[in-house]
Amino acid sequence: MAGLAFFDLDGTLLDNDRDIIPESSLKALELLRRGGWRIVLSTGRDMDTHYSIRYRSIVRPDAVIHQNGGKVTVGDKLLYKHVMDKKLLSEILSFCREKGFCMGSSVGDKDYFINPEKKTAADRAYNRFIERHFVPFEGLLDPDIEVVGLSFAGNIQEEKPQIEKHFPQLELFAFSSNAGADVVERGFSKAEGMKRLCSYYDAEGEQTVAFGDSPNDIALLKAADIGVAMGNADEAVKRAADHVTDDIRHDGIFNACRYLGMI
């Protein structure tokens, strides 16, 4: 029986080291479509930003869970969007500026960051091939700029605890490179995005299968009927999964879909 298949991007569909989505993964996506599955991208990125749109055009998802559930779209339709409170945002940015941390967000074709050189270093550590368009971070406080989530770059072990202690309403999901983290308000997750899409599609009774590799995927893998961890996933993600497949360079997506009888 077909249903909804949820895929993380970085480290799951996208091989960041080579900046490609493996042919076997694209083949699996096409076979899933033919079999009636709805394809959902579920990522910490905003897939509408200048450096992510090209991946969306390659995957051709039916729907996207952006920024860890902060925004949900179906095709060109905006289904849900949470906008951060400007007062909270101002407090976060002031704190990080005083501490010398790198914090910010990408909105559209612009990258608003404190200490942007640290963001560039984090991109390199994560092997992200991104051409950044940095502008002053204060632009995030413009009433016309809607900020859904933030991105942190820096020392996870030392700086992440300081941010979460000062702002208990925030949760930082570390990248697999440990060079940065997605920053979200507690209560938002990819799993919540899944619930919104299942409601939209009236998908009660349909199977949900989720694929991921990083800590921000754990809630999604647990919420799905079947959670699949990539072979290259963090150990905590593997423990949370129902099935662990091969890594991204050894046809992990295709092999899992075949093993589960999805294709």
Predicted features along the sequence, with ranges:
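Short active-site oxyanion
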Residues: 36-40, 60-62, 148-150, 206-208, ...
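Mg2+-dependent phosphoryl-transfer enzymes with acidic/Ser/Thr/Gly-rich catalytic loops
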Residues: 1-4, 22, 181-263
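Short hydrophobic/aromatic-enriched beta-strand-loop microsegments
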Residues: 61-67, 82, 127, 172-175, ...
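Short, structured coil segments at secondary-structure junctions
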Residues: 57-60, 68, 166-169, 223-224, ...
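Hydrophobic packing residues within well-ordered alpha-helices of enzyme cores
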Residues: 50-54, 163, 237, 253
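Asp-based phosphoryl-transfer active-site loop
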Residues: 3-18, 221
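Conserved acidic, metal-coordinating active-site core of Asp-based
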Residues: 91, 95, 99-211, 215-220, ...
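Active-site phosphate-binding/coordination module
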Residues: 20-120
